[in-house]
Amino acid sequence: MDLKTELNGNLMVIFVREERLDAHNSDELKAEMNRIFERGTKDILLDLKEVRFIDSSGLGVLVSGFKNASTRQGSLRLCGLQTQVKSMFELTRLHRVFDIFQTVDEALESY
């Protein structure tokens, strides 16, 4: 999986550079988020602007990351959702769980 990470203060931004977040690659994202949390970072921002498709495995990894962050008194926030991905969040009502922003800059301002 093509991921780029960028530390911004105490916050880690993960840029997901894949068109799909599904059963074939979601475990890699989960492992990366777990590594980041284990190093002591509490807040992660996921930039999903390149992701055009997400399945239940991808959503499950995001929920797992959200729970992991919450356990550490941190947060997992999302930005850059494309229309199809946003529709999946609305269909599953996960848009009520996550803080979702249009852009990285908008999300960074929320911290």
Name each region found by the language model.
Residues 99-103:
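Short acidic-hydrophobic, aromatic-tinged amphipathic segments that line or gate anion-handling sites
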